[in-house]
């Protein structure tokens, strides 16, 4: 049984390349001691992501591993159980029902209509960076506050509550800073907050925020239950910004490692769309897809996975599969890419369009304002999140060097 190498979180790709050379799926033991099956090639990954006998709800599978995962990932507190009634934990027909109810709130036109506001938020954050006397942490000052502000505005969260939302988000995501007690406290607080938010809307009237839209979502009289609504708000909070933080940070790091490419984006901002798509493939924000379980034996690449087993799909590995992508270790925005960074099948990320749009705006506004941005530390000194699910930096110190411009393109006043 394989173990994750010591440098896995910093650079997982050599490990993945070795695994792909040996087979499509491997048994591994995580650092928590949990045993799982890791799927590493593109075709097998897509097969698992759409396989009818691979489930999201561990209670629909049987076996020791599924029971262990269910015990470890739910039931910690009553709040945790209430936050589990969302799309990522559901299988058909429940998943189909939930997705039908919530999809209108994420309509492409509604997401694209946010672009002017996202641009304004980006420029406000860059204005603050422009006033810094020395190096700044681009994650702390830009990549994190941009999407969390967007999500909070979407959810109708008041400005004074957004710092608390950020703290809760950090606590519940798998990071070295997370503790069981901290996660329990954060989930309890999130449930209490959304309970009060829903009650306030029902008493005082609805707005144009996502919680209000979810409250009124209906399909032939079917509506979200209270706990389903709370769970969806929680999912939007966490999934709605974590991937974007990583996507922005990973992309900026990749560009700063190749200064001519960074400057080229400054000269040709329209190139941002294929650049973001290639970044999603090359070093995307999600390392491994969320947990899945076998409800019946399945065979992948000649290997049978028994019933009731935990299955992890390594999206980061699948997107560098040599049998599907030419020279996959090269960053090439000109390639025609059909990556699976946002998943595949019925669980394809509902917020993919929002994440893409935020990343495009974040990058073009950044390079416009700071065309000579550069790293403030050696790349080897950067710290990566120790999360099996997420692929992202803990910090990104940069010098906002050069002659910045303001939002109109004129030289900015210092």
What are these regions (language model features)?
Residues 1-414:
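Cytochrome P450
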